[in-house]
């Protein structure tokens, strides 16, 4: 039986350990120290490293982990990452035999051009790095709005009960923005209160689910007329150009400046 262990790091990162009680794979180990501590605490042996993109808070711990464990490193072929043994492209599959874990690889460019996500279909898990967040999405550091929207809609096509293991605890700030973008969304208002209660109790808001994101995350709702209307009223989208890409681009630009 596989499970996912949450390992907080830095100010708001989540590193993920997939394990069976004996063996473990780590997703996006930006810092080796908390990973090594968690492996020791739970008496786990590392057998694989999985990376979603090249940013330092996701790959910074790889070299140190490799000093302790001689394991394969899976990562996107199109992102510049050191120490990669298994470069991956869209449609590839990863098998970690020690865990009997099968992962499908999805190319999700936008945050970075080579960003990938891993889907464990049997378990219903998605490890999406900085592409999809609980209530939000990653900044477009390298990609275009069209690329990011396509990537997000690819993730939104996964089953609604898929658990979303994103890499940051940004949920409350994301949902504050979501309420500005779609103030009449009743499901969103309910979610905001529930997530606030979790944070007040120091409980992670991640994982989310695809179904919850589809009903409350504005970046998965760029085709909703209510959001387009809100952007038009705010002068952020032209009435004559309110297609989903224009709406998504306006949402992302607004979020970048939202306080």
From Swiss-Prot:
GO MF annotation terms: hydroxyacylglutathione hydrolase activity; metal ion binding
Residues involved in Zn(2+) 1 binding: 53, 55, 111, 130
GO biological process: methylglyoxal catabolic process to D-lactate via S-lactoyl-glutathione
Binding site for Zn(2+) 2: 57-58, 130, 168
S-S bonds: none
Cofactor(s) in the UniProt record: Zn(2+)
Reaction(s) this enzyme catalyzes, per UniProt: an S-(2-hydroxyacyl)glutathione + H2O = a 2-hydroxy carboxylate + glutathione + H(+)
Entry keyword Isomerase: no
Cross-referenced SMART domains: Lactamase_B
Keywords from the UniProt entry: Hydrolase, Metal-binding, Zinc
Biochemical pathway: Secondary metabolite metabolism; methylglyoxal degradation; (R)-lactate from methylglyoxal: step 2/2
A Pfam family per the record: Lactamase_B
EC id: 3.1.2.6
Family according to the record: Belongs to the metallo-beta-lactamase superfamily. Glyoxalase II family.
Subunit comment: Monomer.
Database matches in HAMAP family: Glyoxalase_2 (MF_01374)
Full protein name: Hydroxyacylglutathione hydrolase
Organism: Herminiimonas arsenicoxydans
């Amino acid at each position: 039986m596989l499970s996912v262990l949450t390992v907080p790091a830095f100010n708001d990162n989540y590193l993920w350990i997939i394990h069976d009680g004996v063996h473990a794979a780590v997703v996006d180990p930006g810092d080796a120290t908390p990973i090594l501590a968690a492996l020791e605490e739970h008496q786990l042996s590392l057998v694989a490293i999985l990376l979603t993109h090249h940013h330092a808070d996701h790959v910074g711990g790889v070299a140190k982990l490799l000093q302790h464990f001689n394991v394969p490193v899976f990562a996107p072929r199109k992102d510049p990452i050191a120490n990669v043994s298994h470069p991956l492209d869209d449609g590839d599959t990863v098998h970690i035999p020690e865990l009997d874990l099968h992962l499908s690889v999805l190319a999700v460019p936008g945050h970075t051009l080579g960003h990938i996500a891993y889907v464990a279909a049997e378990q219903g898990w998605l490890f999406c790095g900085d592409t999809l967040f609980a209530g939000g999405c990653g900044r477009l550091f390298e990609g275009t709005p069209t690329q990011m929207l396509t990537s997000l809609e690819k993730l939104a096509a996964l089953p609604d009960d898929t658990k979303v293991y994103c890499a940051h605890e940004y949920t409350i700030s994301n949902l504050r923005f979501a309420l500005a973008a779609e103030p009449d969304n009743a499901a969103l208002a309910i979610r905001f209160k529930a997530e606030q209660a979790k944070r007040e109790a120091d409980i992670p808001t991640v994982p989310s689910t695809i179904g919850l994101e589809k009903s409350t995350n504005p970046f998965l709702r760029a085709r909703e007329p209510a959001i387009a209307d809100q952007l038009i009223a705010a002068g952020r989208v032209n009435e004559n150009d309110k297609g989903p890409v224009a709406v998504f681009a306006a949402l992302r630009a607004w979020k970048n400046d939202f306080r």
